[in-house]
Amino acid sequence: MCYPVHVENRVVSLVIDATNAELLARFWAAALGWQIVDRGGYGVSIGIDDGPFEIDFRSVPDGPKSVKNRLHLDIKPVSRDQVAELDRLLALGARQVDVGQGSRSWYVLADPEGNEFCLCRP
């Protein structure tokens, strides 16, 4: 598939509100194999050194989330199988919420603050 060369904007970060930005940043840095790249007055950012994209965790006083996400990440293991990666993510503090249906199964997990994400097959 061919994609156009011209783009209107470039996505540089995904911002996630958190009651504990440091906790979520550490979880996601470990889950993705990234590192903390900035700790500012507004929160904590993770990414890859000089990478084009970051995830920013911003502290908000709203308390724990109470509804399903309208946006979630799908992640795919690179260096291990799906079950081994599931075990690793659970050990980091994720919890299993559901299992995907059909022939392309995936696991629905939640991070330490309850934000859902999917673990796909490699």
PLM region spans:
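Glyoxalase I/VOC metalloenzyme domain signal
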Residues: M1-D38, I48-D98, A110-P122
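Short acidic/glycine-enriched loop/turn segments that link adjacent beta-strands
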Residues: G40-Y42, Q101-S105
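Short, charged amphipathic alpha-helical segments flanked by flexible coils
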Residues: S45
